[in-house]
Amino acid sequence: NSALRLLTAERAPSGRMPLVADRDLTGVYIHEALGHPCEADLVAAGDSCLDGKLGQKIGSDIVTVVDDPTIRGGYGAYPIDDEGVNTRAKRLITNGVLTEYLNHRETAAHFGIEPNGGARAQDGLHHPLVRMSNTMIMGGNHDTIDDLMEDIDYGIYACGSRGGQVDTGKGSFQFAAQEAWLIENGELTTPLKDVSVSGLTLEILQNVNGLTRDAKLAAPGFCGKGQTVPVGDGGPIMRISEA
């Protein structure tokens, strides 16, 4: 069905407009564009757009993001990190405010705080790095995707990810969606192809203005940062006022 739709799909319109992202694309955005800049080793190295922003409002009021290695069945779950620290859920953003970085013993000492269980190594031959586990944006107060789309006159619904690029220092990103549809007068209409979403992480976080209630982890995956570790990401269906 996807292949057949793409055969007749139209090219996506250019410009800034409302965007509705499914939980797969939402998860990729949260992992890549937000999760990596929250890694304290990147912050300490000056390679994070979130450097110096702890305690500051960086997203809309409805944005709460957690990294939780204790999620039962989560692909990125682990009870104790690779430096022997018990893990716990970390609230990276709480109601739009940046509240915590991911860290390990070295970066915790650098910032004068307690380690929070973010040390992970690919195997015993590698040195532990600050890594994510199961990272997701929490649900909101909309029941269905129809609720998110009903007041959109013209926008795009994008699903999945075919990869992309992120600059953690500048806070910029670009992702290519697997599938997409035009939204017209609150309804899905024309299938689209070659949909690419780009922008600034902090700007997009401020523009999140709708989330469904049903936040879930999406498909499991692996994250590479010189080493490969299993991770989970996801969230609800997310609406962005302008992207």
Model-identified regions with their sequence ranges:
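N-terminal small-residue-enriched
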Residues: 1-243
